[in-house]
Every structure is written in structure tokens, then in C-alpha cells.
Amino acid sequence: MHQDYFEHDVIVVGGGHSGSEAAAAAANMGADTLLITMKLADIGQMSCNPAIGGIGKGHIAREIDALGGIMGKATDRAGIQFRMLNKSKGPAVWGPRAQCGRRAYARAIRQELEAIDNLKMRSDMVKEILTDDAGETVTGVRTNLGKEFRAPCVVLTTGTFSNGVIHVGEQNFGGGRIGESASHGITGCLHDLGFESGRLKTGTPPRVDGRSIDYSVMEKQPGDPDATAFSFLTDDLPSVEAQLSCWLTDTTPETHEVLRTGFDRSPMFTGALDADGPRYCPSIEDKIDRFSEKDHHQLFIEPEGRDTHEVYVNGFSSSLPEEVQFEALRTVPGMEEAHMHRPGYAIEYDFFPPYQIEYSLETKYVDGLFFAGQINGTTGYEEAAAQGIMAGINAVQKLRQADPIVLKRSEAYIGVLIDDLVAKGTDEPYRMFTSRAEHRILLRQDNADQRLTELGHKLGLASKERLDRTREKERAIDVTRETLSDTTVSPQQVDDYLQSVGTSTLNQPRPVIELCKRPEVDSEDLLRHAGLYDEVVTEAPGMLSAPRLIEIDLKYEGYIDRQKDMVEEMEEKERWPIPDDFDYHALDNISIEARQKLSKVEPDNLGQASRVPGVRASDISVLMVLLKNEGVEPMPKDRDLNLDAMGGDGQSFGVSRETAVEVG
């Protein structure tokens, strides 16, 4: 076989949400990329809930899209219901969520990947990471079929497959997902290279035949009439009439009694399964045990697609014996005749505590080796995909001999995610919430393109169409802001509306922009009532109208200014780099705990050091004095992308290959 078949720029191991984004990013940025996964038919598989987004997670999905990722486009094509969560609260914490067709989503991801010319795929299992003789630099991978593939950068995205064990009642067996084999060999190989691993668990609920459910006794949960897309490139979504509904029901005291009969055979209670699981997604038996005073728990009955009757019983994750799950389901209102396609199960798997990775997601022990996704201790498709796109970006940056891209906490939820993992670590599956982001007012889901698309385009990942749309949106906002400032309304035009929303009426004509600052006023309703909507509104690409975006900024103005001050203060610390060989153990004037934690995390700068648990403000002050004494200079305020190192021949690195996929 020709040697070129075995040699690549980047190898991505695993074709889940993380691996798909990593492979797409690296290939779209110009790297010759090989994606190796156990079954090509399972690329982009939704192992658990057939949905993308939610509170915090939806922000991440839109950030991935803004950078030029594929998750948003696949979600919009596969979506069967679209909703904006948290609308009763402020816009900063609104979270888009889409129910997807499970098979349709995987098909859309596969189509996105197959549209990239320099991305190759292989069905095989990687069992060994290859390095140089010193074990310090990655050189490639060896597969189950005995083939060696070489690359200077390897991205590991093993998900739940690394030494995965599935539990259903007293039964347990190897697997990475029900019906699929676990992968073996990588953990032992990484141990030999000096890495430490741990075990985590997650779970999934039973699947049920929707034809056996009585929906008439359940509460209908339709999609939004003004559906919000995930991709900034999407123009059209299904009407609310064309969307499929989800349904709400509840467990009963009888359900709980039936479930308790299986506790003595539950791996969670017998000790057969002692790995930590997701705190915010407990199993139904865990909820009953921990919240014994509650006589019911809400369940969401979610369709798995337009091409199947199968439904997902969200809220009923379980590893109890199959017969107990079946009998308990039949005590739930509307599910008295339920036919169970398959039981829920728990799965435990290997992960590698994230103190072993840099902020670029490159590992500290092996040069050129990157970890992304559940291998770093996260849970959730969006969290995995976010790490995947950043690992793919930074693998190419390494090939370019350019600086790694590290998003700040003030720039993106992706930055919050990675900073939390590296600085704080995790001993349980980590998931994103808006509450984790201290600068969340700046990080709205509607402005992800304004925050990240220009960066994605400079890197050669986001297409020119994306950048043009972002600039068009910004122009629309500027023009509309000027129009709202120049346009006045009289009391006769708007007093009825102002009274109806409970705010004071006008004594004289006032600029529209002034009224938009009032908490009670909806900018679009105000303009419609005044007869100015068609005259003023310039639709901005990216889902929300320009007046709505301006209104949000106006109402948050004071908070935004305060958060920008906080960001500036933190960025001053982040400008102070800490040398790679800095010896914290030699410092007698910081606490022992700080020395130990900082030596383990190895932060890149003072800002990162200040967020390491156990490090005090006084420790940071001492570090700053020491850095100054050693002649360390603060870095420039603006990120240096080292664009000269990115290639400029139009055929190699630096040319976006993001492709629009037409689906018939």
C-alpha cells in the first residue's frame, strides 16, 4: 500500500460529538485528517437524549457554530422541535433547545464530514498510542487490525468506550454503548506514558414504543411558534405546526414502590457500580432514594424522530433489573400499556483527570497528543463537541507552529468549560450551566457570532459567508440603533401601549430608544403599536431582530459596563505569563496548599493561577512580585494569532473549507 495511506497531519480517534467536531475543524482548516472510529455507521450517534442544547448547553452549541463547527447545522437539519428555555428570565440565560431525530442527526453529521475533501475516515479500533523512544512525543496510532497510522498530532475522543462496562440490574458486560463493544488497550498504554485515570459513570432511560402510550392523559409540550435556529447560517425552520410535540407526565407513589423492590439488585446500591455519576442527571432510583419525601417526579416523553415510533423517557434513567423498570413504567399515567423496546442501563468508563492537559487540550506528558470530550471528565454532547472543535483547532495551530487558541472566560462558555476543567478539575461528570459563567451577561446565545466568528474566520475555519453574515448583522444593529435614537413617538402613538404594560405614559414626544430602556417595554410591540415596525426594523441574520438585540443591550447596560470592568481587572492578571519551568515548591512565602495545587495544574498566567482552588489572593500577590523580580513582562492586550505562521499559499493551512451540505 502507498505510504501516503498511512501518513496524515492529524489523526482523530473516535467519531462521537467530540471526534466529529475535532476532525471537521482540523480538516476544514486545511490539515490532512484521518478519523478512526469503530463503526462508521455510528458517527455522530446520540447515545442518550435525542436533543441538543438547553440552559448553558445551547450557548455552547451556538458558540461551536459561530466558530465554524458542524453541530448547529446538523441540529437544524435534524430538528423536529425547537424551543427557547428560560424565557421567563433575562435574555442572558435563555437557552435554545432542539429535539432531534436520532438517525437524522447522525446522518447530518456524516454528511457534513463526507463533504470535506481532505478528511478521510476508517472503521477500526485504536488500541495503542505510538510515541518516540522517549515516550514524550506522539507519532501515531496502532489499530486492532495491526495497522500503524502516523501523524504529528493525535486527538483522543474515546467517550464512554474506554474499558466501558454496562450494568442492568445484577447483569454487567463490556460495552461502550448498548450493542457495541468497549475499546481496550488505550488506558494501559496511557498509564505506561505516565497518565493517571479514574472511573466515571452515566446512564440512560428505557426506550418505549410510542404507539403503546395514551397521550390523552399527558400534558402536551409543543415547540415555539417563533423557533430559534442553532446555526447562524440557517434561514428556515419548520413551522410550529410541522414540529412534533413532547409530552409531560409524572411518576406516582406506586411507581416508587415498584422501583424500591429492585433496590437490592441495583448496582448502585449493591456496590457493583461505585463510580461517580452526573450530579444533575440522577437515575430514577437515586431520586427516589435521595428525595424520599417526594411522591412524584416529572417525566418528559420525547419522540426519537419522524421516521420511528420510538420515544425516549426523559427523567427515568435507570440501571434496575429490566423487569422492575418494565413494571414501574406501567404505573405511570399514560403508560399503562407501554411496550419497552429496551431497558435503561448505567455505564462506567475510564477518564483521565484534566489536570493532565493544557488549556489548549494538549496533554502535559506527551507532545502532540490531545484529549477531548468525556475522556476529560465531562458529560453531554455539547461539552464534548466544544472540546472537540478546540482540540482540532489547536492541533492545526501546533502544525502551523502558531500559538494555541485559548478562549477566555469572558469570551465564551467554551472558555469557562475548559478553564474549569484545567484549573479546578473534576471528580464527577462535569456539565455546563449558565451559573458557572461569571460574565454570562456578556455571553448571550444570540451574540455568539459577534464574539467568535471573526476569530474562526481568521483561523481559516469559519467561512466567508459566516463572516459576511456577522458583519451584516452588526451593520443592521448600528443602523437601527441610529434610527431608534432619531425617531420620536408622541403620547397619542404609544400611551395606550405603555399603560397596558404598566409603565408611565408620556408628557411629550420621546425618542424610541429611550422607551426601549424601560423594563416593561417590548421593543417590537412598541414599534408595532406606534405603526413604525416596517419602517424601523432591519432583520438581522442570527434569529433576533435588530431592535430586540439593541433592547437587550440597553436594559443590561449598567450590568454590562460593570462586567466589562471585572473582565478588564482579570485580564490584567492574565497578561502576566508564568514560565513553564516555574518551581512553586521553591517558594516559602506562599501556602503549602497553593504550592501543591499550582504545581499540579501548572497555570499559564496569573489569572488562571488565581482560579485554582486553594490559591489565595495573597499567594497571587506574592507570585506577581516574584515574576516582576525575575524580569517577566506582561503580554500585549490583544491575542497574537501569529497569522504569518498559518500559511498563505491558498492550498494549505489558512483556507476555510467549510462546506454547505444540501440534503434532499
From Swiss-Prot:
Query: What cystine linkages occur within this chain?
Result: none
Q: Name one GO cellular component term.
A: cytosol
**Which PROSITE patterns does this entry report, sorted A to Z?**
GIDA_1, GIDA_2
Report residues binding NAD(+).
Answer: 277-291
* Any GO BP annotation: tRNA methylation
Q: Does the keyword S-adenosyl-L-methionine apply?
A: no
Record flagged with keyword Transmembrane helix: no
Identify one Pfam family in the record: GIDA_C_1st
Location relative to the cell: Cytoplasm
Domain of life where this protein originates: Bacteria
Q: Cofactor(s) for this protein?
A: FAD
> Mind telling me which InterPro entries this protein's record contains?
FAD/NAD-bd_sf, GIDA_C_N, MnmG, MnmG-rel, MnmG-rel_CS, MnmG_C, MnmG_C_subdom, MnmG_C_subdom_sf
* MF terms (GO), sorted A to Z: flavin adenine dinucleotide binding
* Principal location class: cytoplasm
Alphabetic keyword roster: Cytoplasm, FAD, Flavoprotein, NAD, tRNA processing
Outline what the protein does. Answer: NAD-binding protein involved in the addition of a carboxymethylaminomethyl (cmnm) group at the wobble position (U34) of certain tRNAs, forming tRNA-cmnm(5)s(2)U34.
Q: How does it assemble?
A: Homodimer. Heterotetramer of two MnmE and two MnmG subunits.
Q: What family is this? A: Belongs to the MnmG family.
Name of the featured protein: tRNA uridine 5-carboxymethylaminomethyl modification enzyme MnmG
The species this protein belongs to is: Salinibacter ruber (strain DSM 13855 / M31)
What gene is it encoded by? Answer: mnmG
